[in-house]
Amino acid sequence: MSNPEPDDSNNRIVAVTLDEESIGRSGPDIEHERAIAIYDLVEKNLFAPEGAGEGPFTLHIGITGNRLMFDIRREDGAPVITHLLSLTPFRRIVKDYFMICDSYYQAIRTATPDKIEAIDMGRRGIHDEGSRTLQERLAGKVRIDFETARRLFTLISVLHWKG
């Protein structure tokens, strides 16, 4: 007899806020990415802090010093846990991601569809690398699926980017 899969219907984020002090000032393309990532994240995600019991949860993301802060709370605002993660593993990935994003946003205005597609494939590859790194850094702390990691990586990039 196999163990039944856990019911994760309540293990999700219902609201996300970004620390205003941490947000890098950026252009409309980056702000658009941030808004889409927050919307998509709240619509569909898996987010289960280890040992916290069932959600749903709210998440406040910020940068404090040299660390990424995940302030996790219950829907009613009761604190669950705050995780501080080193930014070091993300620095190169975020830098590469924004370099290729700049190329992508320039290309969509002037380049051929083949060139745009090639740049976009590279952009998605770097984004996937950042998402996997985030999943690894949260292992044993918060269980997330890959799509949730992708959306969270977008938000981390927006916070980290100082344009």
From Swiss-Prot:
InterPro entries: UCP032146. It comes from the Bacteria. Belongs to the UPF0262 family. This is UPF0262 protein Rpal_5021. It comes from Rhodopseudomonas palustris (strain TIE-1). The lineage of its organism: Bacteria, Pseudomonadati, Pseudomonadota, Alphaproteobacteria, Hyphomicrobiales.
